[in-house]
Amino acid sequence: MEMYFKRMKDEWTGLVEQADPPIRAKAAEIAVAHAHYLSIEFYRIVRIDPHAEEFLSNEQVERQLKSAMERWIINVLSAQVDDVERLIQIQHTVAEVHARIGIPVEIVEMGFRVLKKILYPVIFSSDYSAAEKLQVYHFSINSIDIAMEVMTRAFTFSDSSASKEDENYRIFSLLENAEEEKERQIASILSWEIDIIYKILLDSDLGSSLPLSQADFGLWFNHKGRHYFSGIAEVGHISRLIQDFDGIFNQTMRNTRNLNNRSLRVKFLLQIRNTVSQIITLLRELFEEVSRHEVGMDVLTKLLNRRFLPTIFKREIAHANRTGTPLSVLIIDVDKFKEINDTWGHNTGDEILRKVSQAFYDNVRSSDYVFRYGGDEFIIVLTEASENETLRTAERIRSRVEKTKLKAANGEDIALSLSIGAAMFNGHPDYERLIQIADEALYIAKRRGRNRVELWKASL
């Protein structure tokens, strides 16, 4: 890639050097005068494509993209020799964002085609001479084509790397502590089954019972299990079993009086038992040949490291957009960790990180993700958790750590606390924006005295 970018730098530099200065000046003049119009027209046309629309439907994104597009047009069409290296880096950065969000390369290519199409009448409606118009158009189109090539090549490289990480994460997830995960999920679905059966046998209210897809097991399967075992036939079988039983469950919940009829009650209980039994059999088959593998895991805390953060965020954001379900993030910092580490030593610091990590695991669901983000900072991705549920989870974790007892080597008690920033997904497709606003909330929590939870609001 380095050699390629050097070659493109030489080509772009050559294009700028060969163009007459008055022609370059006129191209820059066109860009400055018409960038706003070109940006608006560009997104108007691009949004007609339904595939592109899904990436541009967020109002905040559209507003930011329009202003970014204006700057991009001015930068590319006003390029001087000294600007070329910086412009190549800009294309690389834009490509990384596109890959991170998951914008397909064909949408990017369509965008460049649209830009060149709408630029033509703008240039040829100017009061330049016919020869000047042709030269300005030639310089502008070649500049855009070089920028497009650099961006597309960088995008393909980033997207390919992301695809490899997606597959690496799938394999890691499949292999990581598989036996324990299998037993945990079997216990989860059995607990759900027992809860419903007891309520039916004791004539208790079923109103608080959840359909299988919304129970802990169902959430784990939809957010993790499907991905772990992608492409294996048993996944489809489990999906159908969950879907079919949810239909029966919802129908029963609409008229619970039917359960007073013994034959209907027995039929419903057998449907529960058969569904759970089949799912457990299929789960055992899926996990049967899986063994432990720890690539992608933080050795000290046994949490995920940040390697798979893009893969998971991209998938969960796509799921949230597709289903309309909530998604939230907690960024967590151990208060005064450096001071504790410096005072009591690294062994004590490591023990604190292990205890804090255990508090995370004990207070999240199996469908959530916990990462060691770096040092004493952690990220938790909460799937299908409302704002209230997100804050309750954060407060539970904070309270648990505050009550954790830890003694230094000399017997002195060490006080532990966490500052937590929370943020709800608001439709912006770039996960780094979600992390950024959660980080802003974390900063507020620290500024307001630490040992507290703050939820990001636009007014913060």
Swiss-Prot record:
Effect after changing residue 43 to F/W: Same biofilm formation activity as wild-type. Markedly enhanced O(2) dissociation but not association rate constants. Highly enhanced autoxidation rate constant
Positions that bind Mg(2+): 333, 376
Residues holding substrate: 341, 350
Outcome, altering residue 98 to A: Same biofilm formation activity as wild-type. Loss of heme-binding ability
Annotated consequence of substituting residue 60 to L: Same biofilm formation activity as wild-type. 5-fold reduction in O(2) dissociation rate constant. Significant decrease in the autoxidation rate constant
Annotated site residue numbers, Critical for restricting water access to the heme distal side to avoid rapid autoxidation: 65
GO biological process: cell adhesion involved in single-species biofilm formation; negative regulation of bacterial-type flagellum-dependent cell motility; response to oxygen levels; response to stress
GGDEF domain mapped to chain residues: 325-458
Record's note on what induces expression: By RpoS in the late exponential growth phase and upon entry into stationary phase. Expression is higher at 28 than 37 degrees Celsius. In rich medium DosC and DgcM are the major RpoS-dependent GGDEF-domain containing proteins in the cell, whereas in minimal medium it is the major RpoS-dependent GGDEF-domain containing protein. Highly expressed on solid medium. A member of the dosCP operon.
Organism domain of life: Bacteria
UniProt keyword Heme present: yes
Active site: residue positions: 376
Pathway per the UniProt entry: Purine metabolism; 3',5'-cyclic di-GMP biosynthesis
Keywords, alphabetical: GTP-binding, Heme, Iron, Magnesium, Metal-binding, Nucleotide-binding, Transcription, Transcription regulation, Transferase
EC number, UniProt record: 2.7.7.65
Annotated site residue numbers, Transition state stabilizer: 338
Pfam families on file: DosC_2nd, GGDEF, Protoglobin
Gene3D superfamilies the UniProt entry points to: 3.30.70.270, Globins (1.10.490.10)
Site positions (Important for oxygen binding and stability of the Fe(II)-O(2) complex): 60
Binding site for heme: 98
Family matches, as NCBIfam families: GGDEF
Function: Globin-coupled heme-based oxygen sensor protein displaying diguanylate cyclase (DGC) activity in response to oxygen availability. Thus, catalyzes the synthesis of cyclic diguanylate (c-di-GMP) via the condensation of 2 GTP molecules. Is involved in the modulation of intracellular c-di-GMP levels, in association with DosP which catalyzes the degradation of c-di-GMP (PDE activity). Cyclic-di-GMP is a second messenger which controls cell surface-associated traits in bacteria. Overexpression leads to an increased level of c-di-GMP, which leads to changes in the cell surface, to abnormal cell division, increased biofilm formation and decreased swimming (the latter 2 in strain W3110). In a strain able to produce cellulose (strain TOB1, a fecal isolate) overexpression leads to an increase in cellulose production.
This protein's name: Diguanylate cyclase DosC
Record lineage: Bacteria, Pseudomonadati, Pseudomonadota, Gammaproteobacteria, Enterobacterales
